[in-house]
């Protein structure tokens, strides 16, 4: 993911003008990175280092989504709908 893709994601999910670290932005960035690593893993099945990194990112996203579900239920539902995540 390059700077331009990252800034597009941040602009789409930010709450205010200077927001780059809210939970929504973090989850959106992690989701983009997870999609990127998933396509890499399809082509490179024996890349175990990437597999471990992918599982780490999925766990981090899961913890952030759990926090968001407990603190902001409506925002959680909207975010998973926008990102196309199931639940």
Curated annotation (Swiss-Prot):
<dbReference type="GO" id="GO:0019843">
    <property type="term" value="F:rRNA binding"/>
</dbReference>
<keyword id="KW-0694">RNA-binding</keyword>
<keyword id="KW-0689">Ribosomal protein</keyword>
<dbReference type="Pfam" id="PF00312">
    <property type="entry name" value="Ribosomal_S15"/>
</dbReference>
<dbReference type="GO" id="GO:0006412">
    <property type="term" value="P:translation"/>
</dbReference>
<keyword id="KW-0699">rRNA-binding</keyword>
<comment type="similarity">
    <text>Belongs to the universal ribosomal protein uS15 family.</text>
</comment>
<comment type="function">
    <text>Forms an intersubunit bridge (bridge B4) with the 23S rRNA of the 50S subunit in the ribosome.</text>
</comment>
<dbReference type="InterPro" id="IPR000589">
    <property type="entry name" value="Ribosomal_uS15"/>
</dbReference>
<protein>
    <recommendedName>
        <fullName>Small ribosomal subunit protein uS15</fullName>
    </recommendedName>
</protein>
<keyword id="KW-0687">Ribonucleoprotein</keyword>
<comment type="function">
    <text>One of the primary rRNA binding proteins, it binds directly to 16S rRNA where it helps nucleate assembly of the platform of the 30S subunit by binding and bridging several RNA helices of the 16S rRNA.</text>
</comment>
<dbReference type="InterPro" id="IPR009068">
    <property type="entry name" value="uS15_NS1_RNA-bd_sf"/>
</dbReference>
<dbReference type="GO" id="GO:0022627">
    <property type="term" value="C:cytosolic small ribosomal subunit"/>
</dbReference>
<dbReference type="InterPro" id="IPR005290">
    <property type="entry name" value="Ribosomal_uS15_bac-type"/>
</dbReference>
<comment type="subunit">
    <text>Part of the 30S ribosomal subunit. Forms a bridge to the 50S subunit in the 70S ribosome, contacting the 23S rRNA.</text>
</comment>
<dbReference type="GO" id="GO:0003735">
    <property type="term" value="F:structural constituent of ribosome"/>
</dbReference>
């Amino acid at each position: 993911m390059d700077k331009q893709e990252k800034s597009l994601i941040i602009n789409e999910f930010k709450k205010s003008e200077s927001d780059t670290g809210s939970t929504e932005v973090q989850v959106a960035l992690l989701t983009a990175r997870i999609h990127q690593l998933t396509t890499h893993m399809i082509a490179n099945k024996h890349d175990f280092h990437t597999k471990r990194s992918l599982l780490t990112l999925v766990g981090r996203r899961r913890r952030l989504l759990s926090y968001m579900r407990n603190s902001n239920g409506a925002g959680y539902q909207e975010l998973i709908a926008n990102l196309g995540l199931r639940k």
